[in-house]
Structures are given as structure tokens and as C-alpha cells.
UniProtKB/Swiss-Prot annotation:
Species of the source: Drosophila melanogaster (Fruit fly)
Signal peptide: 1-23
Protein name as annotated: Protein Turandot M
InterPro entries per the UniProt record, alphabetical: Turandot
Keywords: Immunity, Innate immunity, Secreted, Signal
Listed GO CC annotations: extracellular region; extracellular space
Induction behaviour: By a variety of stressful conditions including bacterial infection and heat shock.
Domain of life of the organism encoding this protein: Eukaryota
Cytoplasm recorded as keyword: no
Single GO BP term: defense response to Gram-positive bacterium
Gene this chain is encoded by: TotM
Coarse class of the protein's main subcellular location: secreted
Known role: A humoral factor that may play a role in stress tolerance. Requires Mekk1 expression in the fat body to regulate response to septic injury and consequent immune response.
Family designation: Belongs to the Turandot family.
Keyword Isomerase: no
Length: 131
């Protein structure tokens, strides 16, 4: 096969794959954002559900924090809380695969993360109403 045709086909295929990956990432971002917004933005959702979704919220923020348009003070608080959460999670002692009972700081940090999630969701509602 002619090298020019081969390289052209390879380039078109590469651009197609990159566009598809970018579209999948965008879909994943929008889907997860909507799911977390429905958890933390809805006051009828119980606290247990919010606590169960903390890991998802932390993962989402780590992955997409550059795409979230938060106020600088809220962004700073989020970074600080997530850093503390990861530090406390790293200190958790597992007994037969489950965390040992006790400990004061991790539940406190989880409470603060839930409150942060609610605050970020309410900020999103305010922006949606304003625009």
C-alpha cells in the first residue's frame, strides 16, 4: 500500500479515536455530575445515601476539578477537605477487610464533605437560576 495513503488512513483513524474518547469522557462527566447533583442537591435524599456517595464525590472532584467552576474559597475548602479525607482514609486500620470501629476524625471529615457536596450543589442551582 502506498505510504501516503497508509499514513492518511492512520491519521483519520487516530483523530476518530481521539474524538470518540473525548466524547465518552464528556458523557461520563455529565452523567456523574447529574447523579451527584441529584444526591447532594435534593434535600429529600437521606443522609445515609449522601454518606454512601462520598467516595464517588471524592473521585469525581479529583478527576474533574479543573472543569468545575467553583468560587476560589469553595475550591480551596474542597481541596483541603479532600486532602484530609485521603489522609484519614490512609490511616484506617482494616481488620479482616473491614475498618475497625472507633476513630473520631474520619467521621468528622465525612460530615464536612457531605456539607461541602450540598453547598456545591446549591451553588450549581444558583448558577442555573441566574443564567
Amino acid at each position: 500500500m502506498n505510504p501516503t495513503i497508509y499514513l492518511s488512513c492512520l491519521m483519520v483513524f487516530s483523530v476518530f479515536l481521539l474524538g470518540k474518547v473525548n466524547a465518552e469522557n464528556e458523557d461520563e462527566f455529565v452523567t456523574e455530575k447529574q447523579r451527584l447533583f441529584s444526591v447532594y442537591g435534593d434535600s429529600s435524599v437521606d443522609e445515609a445515601t449522601k454518606y454512601r456517595n462520598i467516595d464517588s464525590l471524592v473521585t469525581f472532584y479529583d478527576k474533574y476539578f479543573t472543569r468545575l467552576q467553583l468560587k476560589p474559597d469553595l475550591n480551596t475548602r474542597a481541596h483541603d477537605l479532600l486532602r484530609r479525607y485521603k489522609e484519614e482514609n490512609a490511616r484506617v486500620v482494616l481488620v479482616d477487610g473491614t475498618p475497625a470501629q472507633g476513630g473520631f476524625w474520619l467521621p468528622l471529615v465525612k460530615l464536612l464533605i457531605v456539607q461541602l457536596g450540598v453547598e456545591i450543589a446549591s451553588e450549581g442551582v444558583k448558577r442555573a437560576i441566574e443564567s
